[in-house]
Amino acid sequence: MEVVKGRGYVYSIQYHIVWCVKYRRDVLNGQVAIKLKELLPQISKDNGFQILEMTIEEDHIRMLINCTPQHYIPNIIKAMKGVSARLLMKEFGDDLRSKLWGGHLWNPSYFVATVSENTEEQIIEYIRSQKRK
């Protein structure tokens, strides 16, 4: 767990985040999953946080992120879900709309938990082990 020094403060902030496809449909596969693996790191870079670990399942995403004290978790989620949905719908819209309805890719809810120095390795191993065989 990396401790970062800012101007007037020292921090180490990690979150374990999970969110699902609307209706838990299996749509995050093939070219959609490949594109999503490219998009999410770019979105994190554009918004100033870092994805430390990530797995993309057919119906949900798990990740461990590192961010600064200035980040607000709902804004991080909004950026990742909003930008990725817009770009995936633009590129794969017909295929996605055939499996989803209402024009929504992501379920509006999400799971987030803070990560401590004691649990970071456990969460990384958990995220890695959740890949479907």
Where are these regions (language model features)?
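Basic nucleic-acid-binding interfaces
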Residues: 1-133
